[in-house]
């Protein structure tokens, strides 16, 4: 059976009645019982035929209670938090909790509704540095961060001492009228600090991009 009625899904943002991304639901009887209730399988497909989700539900979930407004992400009502209609989606897909919306936008790293493509007014706020260091992310990112910190602690004093020795040698050569050697040492010092700053900025940008993107949005 195929129908055009909107549905809400537990794992992906459900579709709504908009021409941007129409959804087709195919309901099939799977012939099994759960707590004495028959089940059906609902497959939700996008316009291009891509399968978005397969949901197994019991017929008991189809009750007048489910007609109440609920959040399309967590499927909870407005008892704990008010429901908002921030985008152009309608029906059961048009209401959502603010906290659920912020968490969804943060996880997907987007600033628009993926159903109706309405663009939200998003303000990105970087996470506090202490929280960033405490929870840097997955295990491989933690290892990368630890390696970069060790390299930084090792290279920084090495670059500082090397630069100081080069400048000291350049001053000594100037006193002995060896300008060519002095210019060479000064150029070496400049190149050393340029490479050091370039490496530091590159590593900082690489580490901060995935972590600081996990921001609070409003």
Swiss-Prot record:
How does this chain assemble?
Interacts with MARCHF2 and STX6.
Enzyme Commission number: 2.3.2.27
Q: Which SMART domains match?
A: RINGv (SM00744)
Xref: InterPro entries: Znf_RING, Znf_RING-CH, Znf_RING/FYVE/PHD
**Location of the protein in the cell:** Cytoplasmic vesicle membrane; Early endosome membrane
Which residues bind Zn(2+) 2 per the record?
87, 89, 113, 116
Start and end residues, zinc fingers (RING-CH-type): 63-123
Tell me the protein's name: E3 ubiquitin-protein ligase MARCHF3
What Gene3D superfamilies does UniProt report for this protein, alphabetically?
A: Zinc/RING finger domain, C3HC4 (zinc finger)
Record: residues binding Zn(2+) 1 = 71, 74, 97, 100
Q: Name one Pfam family in it.
A: RINGv
Cellular compartments per GO CC: early endosome membrane; endosome; lysosome
**PROSITE patterns attached to this UniProt entry:** ZF_RING_CH
| Listed pathway(s) | Protein modification; protein ubiquitination
Q: Which UniProt keywords apply?
A: Cytoplasmic vesicle, Endocytosis, Endosome, Membrane, Metal-binding, Transferase, Transmembrane, Transmembrane helix, Ubl conjugation pathway, Zinc, Zinc-finger
Q: What is known of its domains?
A: The RING-CH-type zinc finger domain is required for E3 ligase activity.
């Amino acid at each position: 059976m195929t129908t055009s009625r909107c549905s809400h899904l537990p794992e992906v943002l459900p579709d709504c009645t908009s021409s941007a991304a129409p959804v087709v639901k195919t309901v099939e009887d799977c012939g099994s019982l759960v707590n004495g209730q028959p089940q059906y399988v609902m497959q939700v497909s996008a316009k291009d035929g891509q399968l978005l989700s397969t949901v197994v539900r019991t017929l008991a979930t189809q009750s007048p209670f489910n007609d109440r407004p609920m959040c399309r992400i967590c499927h909870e009502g407005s008892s704990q938090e008010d429901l908002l209609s921030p985008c152009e989606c309608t029906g059961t897909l048009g209401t959502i909790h603010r906290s659920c919306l912020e968490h969804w936008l943060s996880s997907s790293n987007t600033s628009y509704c993926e159903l109706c493509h309405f663009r939200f007014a998003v303000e990105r706020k970087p996470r506090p540095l202490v929280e960033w260091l405490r929870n840097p992310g997955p295990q491989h990112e933690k290892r990368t961060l630890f390696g970069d910190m060790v390299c930084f602690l090792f290279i920084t004093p090495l670059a500082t001492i090397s630069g100081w020795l080069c400048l000291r040698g350049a001053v000594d050569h100037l006193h002995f009228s060896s300008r060519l050697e002095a210019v060479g040492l000064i150029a070496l010092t400049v190149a050393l600090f340029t490479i050091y700053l370039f490496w530091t900025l590159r590593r900082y940008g690489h580490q901060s991009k995935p972590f600081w993107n996990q921001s609070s949005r409003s």
